[in-house]
Regions:
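Membrane-interface helix-boundary signature
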Residues: 2-12, 48-51, 80-87, 108-111
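N-terminal signal-anchor transmembrane alpha helix
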Residues: 7-29
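Cytosolic, membrane-interface loops and tails of multi-pass inner-membrane proteins
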Residues: 28-51
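Interfacial helix-start motif at the membrane-water boundary
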Residues: 46-64
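Core segments of transmembrane alpha-helices
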Residues: 58-70, 118-119
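Transmembrane helix-loop-helix
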Residues: 71-117
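Juxtamembrane boundary at the C-terminal end of a transmembrane helix
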Residues: 124-134
Length: 134
């Protein structure tokens, strides 16, 4: 079943997925570059080297969430139950991760908003769309 809010939710889920793929690339493959570690508040190359394995692992978490959100968005037109489940799980996880980020580090509000607002919009739009299905 298809509704306009579901289409909007799919769009926001794809935006959230794209953001998380970029984060994956930065954390898993570009972590030791000064322009990358500065984005994440790392103060020195030594600190970047020390935290590289953590960032690598975290990057893959972001990739897996991105895959879930993207597949959910793409499947909305094929298998709605699976699509809704994937979208709501992946995007809710992204939103909760953003909440954890800002509660653990209040100075990280901007990154939390970047990673959390699109999936929140996806969750809200998808739920509204589900409720609109007759």
């Amino acid at each position: 079943m298809f509704t306009v809010p579901i289409l909007i939710g799919s769009l926001f889920a794809m935006i959230a997925a794209a953001i998380h793929v970029v984060i994956f690339v930065l954390e898993s493959f570009r972590w030791n570059l000064p322009q990358t570690w500065r984005i994440f508040g790392i103060r020195s190359q030594e600190d970047a080297n020390r935290t590289e394995f953590l960032a690598y692992n975290q990057g893959f978490y972001n990739l897996f969430l991105a895959i879930g959100a993207a597949l959910g968005a793409l499947f909305h037109f094929e298998n709605t139950v699976a699509a809704f489940t994937l979208t709501l799980f992946a995007c809710s996880s992204m939103v909760l991760a953003a909440v954890v980020l800002v509660t653990a580090s209040p100075s990280s509000l901007r990154p939390a908003l970047i990673q959390g607002v699109p999936p929140l919009a996806a969750v809200i739009s998808t739920v509204v769309g589900i409720l609109a299905i007759p």
